Amino acid sequence: MFIFGGKCFLPQDLTASSGNFKRGVFMALRKVVVIAGPTASGKSQLAVDVARSCRGVVVNADSMQVYPDTPVLSAIPSAAERGGIEHCLYGVFPSSKNGTVVEWLVLAAGEIRRIWSEGKLPVVCGGTGLYIDNLINGTTPIPEAEPEVRHKVAEAAAAEGIPALHARLSTVDAVTADRLNPNDSTRVKRALEVFYQTGVPLSVWHRRPMVQKLPEAEFVTLKILPPMAELDERCARRFDKMMAAGALDEVRRLKDMKLPASLPAMKALGVPELLDFLKGNRSLEEAVGLAKLHTRQYAKRQRTWFRNKLKADVVLDACYQGAENIIFDVKKRL
């Protein structure tokens, strides 16, 4: 991709015969824009604006938006919000599945290479730091546990409780156990699955060399780090809009699916709280208030992670609400 006169051109828009130009075309088609930031910070709109300006395709990097049954609560961009721009990897895993970062990476690498092959720009957008970090920096090739191993661990969790499994983990992988919350069911079970499957502690796997899924990619990274006061207000306002858009009906349908509470889709922001209301355990006002609180807390954790962990070429210090200078800054780096 090339910039001339403030406009964005793709290689097929130009003609030249030199070998240097052809190599430049090859490298240009290996660019990937990554847009990261906390929930409600304007990532999706920025991704659409970049994609529209640079003939791009938006690739989802949000671990809740990979599930199809909570489009309102997980803020999957609507047709109107997409504005005619192609989006991919939204709703790709059934809600009955525990999609892994490795599975997402395989899909993302395939989509990014497809987008390159079409002469377009991949615009990866999301708030899941693990997805983005593994895409940019590579991942440890930890084998997935076989179904019988996962079943064994799940049975033990149901019979003994997660704190007991955490105690068991400490006997085989003290390093991992020390860094995990004893009540973090997903990570405690995953660490035990890895050990039972491979005989090697997860902490040892993490010390092994990283493997790049896209070694040929050159990333242009943007992160949005708005003040928490601005983010808090936007989180609360957006949840009110979600309620008006049918979030409660969405959770009611999810409840009818009778999925295990341990699945990621059942942990989306707002789902546990509204489920409590539907079960008669709290008032709707209490459920909404708690969901807003948890959303703000999650946004704060995301903001902290991206501030400390993600190196970026462009940093926005306010929520994105449209700005031509930001788009131009991105173009200069392509």
Whereabouts are the PLM-identified features?
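Phosphate/pyrophosphate-binding catalytic cores of soluble transferases and nucleic-acid-acting enzymes
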Residues: 2-4, 9, 14, 19-334
